[in-house]
Amino acid sequence: MRWERFFDDLEDQLAAEWEAERAALESEAERLRVARLDLRSRLAGLAGEAEGPVALELLDGFVRDVRISAVGADWIAAPEAADARRMLLVPIGAIRGIQVGHGDLLRSARPAETRDRLAERVTFALALRDLSRRRVGVAVGVAAAGEAGAARTLTGTIDRVGADHLDLAMHDAGAPRRAADVRGYRMLPLAGVAWVRVDAGAGAPVV
């Protein structure tokens, strides 16, 4: 028996077994990583990286084509694909589905760089409080109560934001908030808000 050949074969066998074990461990680690992914992480993977527009199916029943530019703690900032001057603030809880290309689908699941930016900890309510503080005119998309599939768009200025709701002074879009021009007031639960739109130059939150 040629011992050199024996030891060579043994080394090859051990190397193959180690490689198989390493691949199995990596595969299991990847499965565990993917199992821990949440929707916010997938959206963060698309922010500024998507090959094309992303179609968001939202709480109000509409589909919005957008380009995700930033992701907060529980919301995204996304200019409309057709008009980048119109910025949508969308709570992640209002998203019912996301249509993406296959490349973007895979990209969103890749391991993300470790970041701890302050913007990523800004909540939806905090972003709305910033709009309220600056008296920025907005459009708010909400589902209509008691009408399945129906939705409304309300325009006005956010007067204040509570823990789970906002107060909207309703007036014409593009007009300043003047008492004489306010048509009425609405308290809107944040859970029922599908999106808030701010036009360019109106002072959208910086994220």
Stretches with model-predicted labels:
Residues M1-R64, A70-V207:
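Short glycine-rich, low-complexity segments
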